[in-house]
Amino acid sequence: EEMLFWTLGFIGQKFYDRFQFAQWGIHLWFYGLPSTGKSAILQFIGDMYDSMDVGILPDNCQADFGLEGMHKSFVILAQELTEKFNLPQALLQQIATDYYLSINRKFDKRENVNFRASFGIASNIVLKYQDNNGSMIRRMLVVHFKNPWPVSKTLNQEAFREITQLIRGRMYLRTCLAYRIMCNYVGKRPIW
């Protein structure tokens, strides 16, 4: 029950400016078996925004230019990551903790940007990063998905029909409320 509360809170965090109420510097990572709903939850988060405000980080993103153009997004979602995912570890760590980043741009100068986007990850595998002295695990809230759901070919259509109800309904309010309660509980202190 406590893990569900924290998970809802970190989903709710995606609907606010990343450092508006807390400076935790933590990514939400859904990890586990296939067909457990990891990507569906990230899709739910993405559907809450205008499509222009969502950055999609593909599994085969370029290591040097993977974040080019994403700094204007409100949320960045990386679904179905595999061992081919090659965003540098240092950059992934900086996304979590630094408000300003220097982003490589193809055929242009690096750009120092105010990086405000929240980040959500879903994968079936442990990513290939090294956890030197806890440098990665303290920047991730890992939610382990263990129980597969029956596959539905119309799941996206069903979810799209219900998303309007969810926006007005309990899930959106619950996630935002859980996040605000977390902020009041932890405050600006480091979460770990």
Indicate where each model-derived feature is located.
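Short glycine-/polar-rich loops that comprise or flank the Walker A/P-loop
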Residues: 52-53, 72-74, 99, 115-118, ...
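Switch/connector loops and helix/strand junctions flanking conserved nucleotide-binding motifs
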Residues: 37-39, 84-87, 127-132, 149-154
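Phosphate-sensing "switch" segment of ASCE/P-loop ATPases
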Residues: 113-116, 132-192
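A short beta-strand-to-loop transition that corresponds to the Sensor-1 phosphate-sensing loop
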Residues: 80-82, 105-107, 116-126, 145-148
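AAA+/SF3 P-loop NTPase mechanochemical coupling elements
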Residues: 64-72, 103-122
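Walker B catalytic acidic pair
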Residues: 32, 78-81
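Conserved catalytic/switch belt of AAA+ P-loop NTPases
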Residues: 50, 89-111
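P-loop NTPase catalytic core of nucleic-acid-dependent motor ATPases
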Residues: 1-72, 141-144, 184-191
